[in-house]
Structure formats: structure tokens, C-alpha cells
Design a protein with these regions (language model features):
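Soluble extramembrane regions of membrane proteins in the secretory/endomembrane system
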Residues: 1-167
Length: 168
């Protein structure tokens, strides 16, 4: 229907509630025989970390996926520790959810902690797949127009869906 669209390079992103739509789009896309979405950037929201039974899961499959998680986000990035104590957004990288995401949906227990701003790669279905979490030191509403967040958007999509002529 749109011959100018490269169907092998479709990326989706959204800030806050827009990322809920992104996660919903991925779930719907997973029902397609041939998924259309190649790259996902979740912006100030949470990825889908577990299935309905609470087991870690990789709903993103062989897509490149990143998260922009503002350090001082007032709404997202919270979790609980192994004792059930609430962890707020500044401690997101210490959470099992963040670590599971960077370990491609597997249980991170007993594994070395992974860091923000690092692309992690794994072979999934014969494809080299990336995961990254960006942690700009800002609050939730600042993130959608922050130069730090927008730099992350450009970096992520240039890595996931490289332009034929790199963006300068």
C-alpha cells in the first residue's frame, strides 16, 4: 500500500502512555505470520517483563529493543526487591526487571549485573539482536523533549535501522 516504506525497517516508539501502545502493537504484531515491527524503543514506561504466570519472557523476539528510563521518573521504572520492598526509579537498573530485559527475557538471578548505556547483543532466530537501557538524569515529563532523550532515540534507531546515509 505504501511502496516507499521499507517493510524490513519499521520501528515504533512512544513516550509514556504511547509506550503502552507500543507494547500493545508488539503483542498484536506477534500474531502475524510475518511480523512487521523490527525495532522498538520504549520511552518512560516499562517493557513487558513477565508472562501472565509471572515468568520472565521475551515478547519482543528478534526485534532490537531499547528503553529510555528517566532516572527521576515519577510514574515508571519502579519495582520491588527480593524482599518485596518498593524500589523507585533511581534504583531501576538494580531491579530484576531491568536485568531480565537486558538478558533478553531470561531470569537474571545469579548473573552479572548489566549496565545502562551499553548495547547487549544476542543471537535470536539467527539474527543479532540488541537490547539497551538509557538512563538520562531527568524527570518523566522532561524526557519527551530532552536533548539527552532525543539523542538516545537517534542513536537507537540508527543502530537498529541504519540509514543508507548515516545521520551526521
Amino acid at each position: 500500500r505504501m511502496p516507499f516504506v521499507d517493510k524490513g525497517k519499521i520501528g515504533v516508539t512512544g513516550h509514556s502512555m504511547g509506550s503502552w501502545s507500543v507494547n500493545a502493537a508488539v503483542k498484536q504484531d506477534n500474531l502475524n505470520e510475518t511480523p512487521l515491527i523490527s525495532a522498538v524503543l520504549i520511552h518512560c514506561n516499562d517493557a513487558v517483563y513477565t508472562d501472565d504466570d509471572g515468568n520472565y519472557v521475551n515478547i519482543y523476539g528478534s526485534r532490537d529493543v531499547g528503553i529510555i528510563s528517566a532516572v527521576y521518573d515519577e510514574f515508571f521504572g519502579g519495582s520491588v526487591d527480593e524482599n518485596g520492598n518498593a524500589l523507585q526509579s533511581p534504583y531501576y537498573m538494580e531491579s530484576a526487571n531491568a536485568q531480565s530485559f537486558l538478558y533478553f527475557g531470561t531470569d537474571p538471578s545469579g548473573k552479572e549485573a548489566r549496565e545502562a548505556y551499553t548495547f547487549y547483543t544476542e543471537n535470536i532466530d539467527g539474527k543479532e539482536v540488541n537490547r539497551i537501557i538509557y538512563r538520562p538524569g531527568i524527570i518523566h515529563p522532561w524526557s519527551h523533549f530532552s536533548a539527552r532523550s532525543e539523542k538516545a532515540v537517534c542513536e537507537f534507531f540508527e543502530k537498529a535501522l541504519p540509514a543508507p546515509n548515516p545521520i551526521a
